[in-house]
Amino acid sequence: MTNIRKTHPLLKIINSSFVDLPAPSSLSSWWNFGSLLGVCLAVQILTGLFLAMHYTSDTATAFNSVTHICRDVNYGWVLRYLHANGASMFFICLYLHVGRGLYYGSYMYSETWNIGILLLFAVMATAFMGYVLPWGQMSFWGATVITNLLSAIPYIGTDLVQWIWGGFSVDKATLTRFFAFHFLFPFIVAALVMVHLLFLHETGSNNPTGIPSDSDMIPFHPYYTIKDILGFLIMLTALSALVLFSPDLLGDPDNYMPANPLNTPPHIKPEWYFLFAYAILRSIPNKLGGVLALVLSILVLAIVPMLHTSKQRSMMFRPLSQCLFWFLVAILLTLTWIGGQPVEXPYVIIGQTASVLYFLTILVFMPLVSIMENHLLKW
């Protein structure tokens, strides 16, 4: 008798995705982050669901409801900090996942790559709206500053901002709709993840060499299921340590003060995972220019496949491109540091230099170095 997992209409989909899926035999730990992101999403949806049972999206009670969760709800503090630090873990895994894609040429699967960029935007939007919900000082002012950027759009900007706010400032209407969207978006993300995997399974996984691996495939289960479970354990241990030992390490102390529209915090800044984009935004003195640079800092990933000039797919055997890749990582770390600093010298000029180098590296240096490597290999 044929195994039920191969004949049952539902089980055979799961079987062909997670059990009998042929996978390259040489996948390194950098291929673990996809499954880790799945775990992060599950953790966020579950903790978020339980938090939503106790949270109230009203300006008068939002801050107090979060305090109530932490003080009065059984293990509410664990839920709250798992959710807040789970977002940080989510973005760490996201950035490493994207970095892996850039390094090993996974962007050549353009459909999977483009859905991934869409996912990145969706997760960023979700995280931004979630940060507004506790209704602390940084929640309120972060929402005011970032939504206000849309007013830079010519002609419709001001109307658009007021439409998003639901009034003439960030207020009750804004908080209520942000809660509604913050609840909805993770499910849209989950649907997009399905599409992401659908397109990935059309082509099969890439591998570290960038060479087609059809001649050397192994079943996903047990090899990669065990490997993924080890990844889960390591990540969940790190997340637990963060939640139980220093839950506020990555947060902003200003958010423990209730939102006050009459008192601006000395330094308005987003969560750490948006600081690189915030630094790029601030490095351009013009409002519209800054907004465009902010969007392009992520959207530039969409044109990376068009800029692939190398005869090889992966950077595994391209030392010059590897140097540029790590240079790009250093630039992003520099931008993250600058995003958290006040707008004064020398930070302004460092941020502007790093922003220019970020775009130059992706758009100019990498394609040129790839062409140079082709010539060095006499290809």
Curated annotation (Swiss-Prot):
Heme b b562 binds at residues 83, 182. Changing residue 235 to K: In strain: Isolate TK 18667. Coiled coil: none annotated. The chain crosses the membrane at residues 33-53, 77-98, 113-133, 178-198, 226-246, 288-308, 320-340, 347-367. GO terms for biological process: mitochondrial electron transport, ubiquinol to cytochrome c. The keyword Transmembrane applies. Keywords: Electron transport, Heme, Iron, Membrane, Metal-binding, Mitochondrion, Mitochondrion inner membrane, Respiratory chain, Transmembrane, Transmembrane helix, Transport, Ubiquinone. PROSITE patterns: CYTB_CTER, CYTB_NTER. GO terms for molecular function: metal ion binding; ubiquinol-cytochrome-c reductase activity. One of its GO terms (cellular component) is mitochondrial inner membrane. Pfam families: Cytochrom_B_C, Cytochrome_B. A ubiquinone binds at residue 201. It comes from the Eukaryota. Heme b b566 binds at residues 97, 196. It is found in: Mitochondrion inner membrane. Heme 1 (or BL or b562) is low-potential and absorbs at about 562 nm, and heme 2 (or BH or b566) is high-potential and absorbs at about 566 nm. Belongs to the cytochrome b family. The cytochrome bc1 complex contains 11 subunits: 3 respiratory subunits (MT-CYB, CYC1 and UQCRFS1), 2 core proteins (UQCRC1 and UQCRC2) and 6 low-molecular weight proteins (UQCRH/QCR6, UQCRB/QCR7, UQCRQ/QCR8, UQCR10/QCR9, UQCR11/QCR10 and a cleavage product of UQCRFS1). This cytochrome bc1 complex then forms a dimer. PANTHER family: CYTOCHROME B. This is Cytochrome b.
